[in-house]
Amino acid sequence: MIPFLPMFSLLLLLIVNPINANNHYDKILAHSRIRGRDQGPNVCALQQILGTKKKYFSTCKNWYKKSICGQKTTVLYECCPGYMRMEGMKGCPAVLPIDHVYGTLGIVGATTTQRYSDASKLREEIEGKGSFTYFAPSNEAWDNLDSDIRRGLESNVNVELLNALHSHMINKRMLTKDLKNGMIIPSMYNNLGLFINHYPNGVVTVNCARIIHGNQIATNGVVHVIDRVLTQIGTSIQDFIEAEDDLSSFRAAAITSDILEALGRDGHFTLFAPTNEAFEKLPRGVLERIMGDKVASEALMKYHILNTLQCSESIMGGAVFETLEGNTIEIGCDGDSITVNGIKMVNKKDIVTNNGVIHLIDQVLIPDSAKQVIELAGKQQTTFTDLVAQLGLASALRPDGEYTLLAPVNNAFSDDTLSMDQRLLKLILQNHILKVKVGLNELYNGQILETIGGKQLRVFVYRTAVCIENSCMEKGSKQGRNGAIHIFREIIKPAEKSLHEKLKQDKRFSTFLSLLEAADLKELLTQPGDWTLFVPTNDAFKGMTSEEKEILIRDKNALQNIILYHLTPGVFIGKGFEPGVTNILKTTQGSKIFLKEVNDTLLVNELKSKESDIMTTNGVIHVVDKLLYPADTPVGNDQLLEILNKLIKYIQIKFVRGSTFKEIPVTVYTTKIITKVVEPKIKVIEGSLQPIIKTEGPTLTKVKIEGEPEFRLIKEGETITEVIHGEPIIKKYTKIIDGVPVEITEKETREERIITGPEIKYTRISTGGGETEETLKKLLQEEVTKVTKFIEGGDGHLFEDEEIKRLLQGDTPVRKLQANKKVQGSRRRLREGRSQ
């Protein structure tokens, strides 16, 4: 009979507990079995934290790190659950004998629980008929229980102790594979719920007590050994907060933000609850601002709550969790302490309630969404924020406004920059503050952003980088209550001059500029556009005589091909390139140019750039010390080949006798602007001695056609219309004519005006400005026998200058209405009035 029991228990274990790939506990156990197989059959490798009795089936991560929660571990080899050693044999070749639940408690070493089961008269129940799951506290768990609680249980074994043990039991067999994450299982004491959590790292907890020895099969159930004694729970998180004096500040904040009631509902929450001491650490102004802002206070409260139940024993390393606020926090461990965002702050852990678990912390967690934009800066942006505060810009960032900070890292500020005149430094900082809130996902290539200083900054988006002007972003963008912050590698320098102006300003580029102008390409670099120009310094032309330069200039096609190979459409910032890989661009000449960013240096056709990212209003300049030449373009002229070979030694220039350079059309990059001006409408409202005049100003419709640069050939004799950039200037005039309104339409009009009797009639004229305005007003205040003016055209003036001068000299110009005269614009109305 005895040999049959081990065989029977092995068969039963295989039937009721097959390995399930979706069962995290079994999966980790299988890994531990594999790591221990060199020690013999059915041996599992465990990691034990040095200086403690805590043991874990190892995960891959912890196994190779040789640490858990930052503490070193040692490897133990033990029999896997359900097996035992035999004297003289390697490994664990025998299965444990099977017994009823009471007997199994002794087999697994839970002798204190076994003794208490006997004392409370529970033994008869768990030896008899039925099927039970017993979460049995280990002997160490009983030793760690509060002494007063333990004495209370021992003094009333028939009621208190029995009830406590029943609260550790389920009236059916449930193996670890059956214990699903988030389950609430009624216990055998008043159906009080047992909260089950089954974590991806293989940890299984019951009311936050970890199963340290699971799946010990019994004839009438199963025993799981746990690392602590379960306490009865019946209150919610809300109930605990309302009853706990040390959470009065948190309670007040939760009530203000309408969060407290939500913590009384069903769920599986984790609350990191700041104590009163934690709130006292906050600057009063910060706390008052947040609590006075409903959105910010709600965000603050929700940032302390997870929608999952995270027991301390489940945390074996850093992991990121999403809060109810929407942002994430990192929960980790350092020895026996829980860390939040890398900081030890948990004073008391694993306060289990009927809808979650509470960890008390000594710091208030403030999410970015509750912070002012200046508070979003981290340790690497303190130079920027300190300067913003010192120069008075921080006070200008109103809590009710919205801004974006483009914050350079600390090492972007050189000693020369910091020693600048404060007025100049303030202007530089203003270039790093935008008037609006712009998140990272709202930025796009070609976007124009306006700073609080009135400067316009351009956005460039590349495969692996986002840049604004000359500086590219680093990771760390955040959004706060009244703005966003983006981190930049360098100080942003807005462009002030065009490509041509930059070349003209810098004497290093005088030779290249003279060749560019000789090739009739000056206009290209003065027009608005987006270009990348690779500019050779004068050193690139050392050794070239004036005669050789003249030869080069005489062959305009060759010169244009060479110059345009240095120019490519689009703005490409050096730091915007993906490091270490070749970026291929097509030049305006048509051939390809190869760029690579290596060790913060831009390589152009494998030549090191001497200086990069010189920003201009219509592009960017990268400086090289060699003349560039397209390797796929042959030369067919001996003289030209000799000159080029003299200047270019890093490639072998092809020579094909008789070959000529292709003609490249002179290109103009323009932005088309169509401006439509609608004539003003004039309305007359009668019924008073003084006419009521309503003037509707000109309507301006501005259409901007965006897209790729337009290239076209300028033919000889063709008229080129220059687009003038900037806002059109519209002069506004008001015409007032007293008398009877006469509507002018597009048809033949005949009208005679006869003035009889002593009645004085005159036409009142008002203009929108001009040097004769005051004199004209004076004239109209004097007695005038008769003034008649027919309005022709639509220029907005009643009289020409010469007519006004004659009028001032005493002449009275009179013009008769002419037949067959069509008035321009069917919507024009003439207003005449009469004044006596």
UniProtKB/Swiss-Prot annotation:
InterPro entries: Adhesion/Biosynth-related, EMI_domain, FAS1_dom_sf, FAS1_domain, TGFBI/POSTN. Disulfide bonds join 44-80, 69-333, 79-92, 208-311, 467-472. Widely expressed with highest levels in aorta, stomach, lower gastrointestinal tract, placenta, uterus, thyroid tissue and breast. Expressed in the kidney. Expressed in the lung. Up-regulated in epithelial ovarian tumors. Not expressed in normal ovaries. Also highly expressed at the tumor periphery of lung carcinoma tissue but not within the tumor. Overexpressed in breast cancers. Residues 97-230, 234-365, 368-492, 496-628 form the FAS1 domain. GO terms for cellular component: collagen-containing extracellular matrix; extracellular matrix; extracellular space; neuromuscular junction; trans-Golgi network. The keyword Lyase does not apply. Changing residue 60 to A: No effect on homodimerization. It is found in: Golgi apparatus; Secreted; Secreted, Extracellular space, Extracellular matrix. Its main location: Golgi. Transmembrane segments: none annotated. Induces cell attachment and spreading and plays a role in cell adhesion. Enhances incorporation of BMP1 in the fibronectin matrix of connective tissues, and subsequent proteolytic activation of lysyl oxidase LOX. This is Periostin. It comes from Homo sapiens (Human).
